[in-house]
Swiss-Prot record:
Amino-acid positions noted as binding GTP in the UniProt annotation, renumbered to this chain: 11-18
Any Pfam family matching the protein: cobW
Lineage: Bacteria, Pseudomonadati, Pseudomonadota, Alphaproteobacteria, Hyphomicrobiales
Keyword Cytoplasm among record annotations: yes
Protein role: Facilitates the functional incorporation of the urease nickel metallocenter. This process requires GTP hydrolysis, probably effectuated by UreG.
Organism: Methylorubrum extorquens (strain PA1)
Protein family per UniProt: Belongs to the SIMIBI class G3E GTPase family. UreG subfamily.
Matching InterPro entries: CobW/HypB/UreG_nucleotide-bd (IPR003495), P-loop_NTPase (IPR027417), UreG (IPR004400)
Subunit structure: Homodimer. UreD, UreF and UreG form a complex that acts as a GTP-hydrolysis-dependent molecular chaperone, activating the urease apoprotein by helping to assemble the nickel containing metallocenter of UreC. The UreE protein probably delivers the nickel.
Record carries keyword Transmembrane: no
Name of the protein: Urease accessory protein UreG 2
């Protein structure tokens, strides 16, 4: 059976993790890349239900699974990811021709990371509305993730946040690791995020030219 790439998506509550999945998935499918989706909630499967509604007609419901962890979000993706690994393996067995599994953690604090037993690669999502101090708080998710997404950039003037300060601090905290600003409502920055994912995580399954060349 071929290796299906596992991409974790973490971040605080309300930062836009689900929105990232909902905007990235149709773009992956348009490129011929076959995704599966797992969402995590502590006591519900509400995110999975929302993703099924949003992606109705785009991805069949059976390929979107909700995991009710019953525990701290980072425990379910780092210290003891057994429930998620079981969900991953079940999906892989049912859909072995898939290319990527997107695994959304429950909303958590800035220390969230993914166990390498669960995810090959992970994206951390923060949002501008939480304040421009967030990147310099030295959270493991901000500093160690493969890609940092700073979402809701359009809200900066309404909350007194400086995108320039966030960019400066992200560079300081992350070194050469990439970060970018997005607005998942309008799609701004989403194609750039997709290109990073293709180049960094899905290079072994992508056989198509870059987005700009294939448009």
């Amino acid at each position: 059976m071929k290796k299906i790439t596992r991409i974790g998506i973490g971040g605080p509550v309300g930062s836009g993790k689900t929105a990232v999945i909902e905007t990235i998935t149709p773009r992956l499918i348009a490129l011929g890349i076959k995704p599966l989706i797992i969402t995590n909630d502590v006591v519900t499967t509400e995110d999975a239900k929302q993703v099924r509604r949003t992606l109705h007609g785009v991805l069949i419901e059976e390929k979107i699974v909700g995991v009710e962890t019953g525990a701290c979000p980072h425990t379910a993706v780092r210290e003891d990811p057994s429930m998620n690994i079981a969900a991953v393996e079940e999906l892989e067995d049912k859909y072995p021709d898939s290319d990527v599994i997107l695994i959304e953690s429950g909303g958590d604090n800035l220390t969230l990371t993914f166990s390498p037993a669960l995810a090959d690669f992970y994206i951390y999502v923060i949002d501008v509305a939480a304040g421009d101090k967030i990147p310099r708080k030295n959270g493991a998710g901000v500093c160690q993730s493969d890609i940092l997404v700073i979402n809701k950039k359009d809200l900066a003037p309404y909350v007194g946040a400086s995108l320039e300060v966030m960019a400066r601090d992200s560079k300081l905290m992350r070194g050469k690791k990439p970060f970018l600003f997005t607005n998942c409502k309008t799609g701004e920055g989403v194609d750039d995020l997709l290109q990073l994912i293709l180049d960094m995580a899905l290079f072994d399954v992508r056989t198509r030219p870059p987005l700009a060349a294939s448009a």
